[in-house]
Structure formats: structure tokens, C-alpha cells
Amino acid sequence: MKKITIAFDVDGTLIQTGATSEWDMIPNRRILRLLEALASFKNVTIVVWSGGGKEWADTAVKMLDIGHLVKATYSKNLKGRDESGAYIFEPDIKPDIAIDDIHACNLGFLNLIVNEK
């Protein structure tokens, strides 16, 4: 059985964009339901990552009470932007599926872009 790793982004994906602390995080319930459903599959591993760093991903997992569903958290290692303005990330892992709000992302082998904006 092939294991599938699915990475969920924090800002603009699991929570609405604009939070500056754990106290103003507004959950995106639709995406959280998706995470919960995918976590129920035997061969799926859920990870959460953020361009804001591993600590921000850890905070989101705690505040959203999804720690029991998440195997690990990571930083997406934001390095800056390229000449077109697109974000440059150098994450430590390449998941099978990356679920994100950034349209110009190529973070996973398959990239699903949420429609939250």
C-alpha cells in the first residue's frame, strides 16, 4: 500500500488570511472538514506547513485542535520572491499533494489550490 502525504498550508487555507496571533485565527471550516476526511484514510499522512514557519504551523494545529490528525508540522522555508513576484519556497519535504491558496505554487507532486479568496 503506497503511503500518500498531504500537506495543508495554514494562512488562506486552514485559516483565513490576516491572522497575526492565535487569538485572531478564523478557521476555514470547509478545508478543516476536508483534512478530517482525508486523515481517515489508512494510507494518508497529514502534515501542516506554513510560509510563516514551523512555529506558526504548530500554533495553528493547536488552536484548530487538529493535533490528533496531523503527523508533523513544517516550515515552507520562504526565501523571497522571484522577478515576477511569485513566492520562492524551499520546503524540507515534497508531499504527494499540497493544498494551498497560492496559485503559482508547485510545492507537491500534485497541487490543489483552494478557492477561499
Positions of predicted regions on the chain:
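Alpha-helical substrate-recognition element adjacent to the catalytic core
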Residues: M1-K79
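C-terminal cap/substrate-recognition subdomain and adjoining C-terminal extension
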Residues: K54-K117
